[in-house]
């Protein structure tokens, strides 16, 4: 694709590379000590009595969040127009209706 514009580029530095190598060498790819450590540190960062759960993707995170707030079939969920398709797809998966709204041209809010 000649004119491809990336949605977002990840910032991957030496620290991130070292952590991935450490995880691979530990034998744990998904669950395990690094995931538990992340969940605990994120909960501590939030500073409230919260529980954090690491998931495999943003789509899974959106699914859990919508389930947690009680979205059910027939509900309407506002989603931004400038987003990844999974934002609206997970709403449909739950039987709800995505309502796509545009963003402010200056602030993108």
PLM region descriptions:
Residues 1-68, 72, 93-94:
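Conserved PLP-binding active-site segment in aminotransferase class I/II-type PLP enzymes
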Residues 67, 71-109:
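PLP-dependent aminotransferase-like
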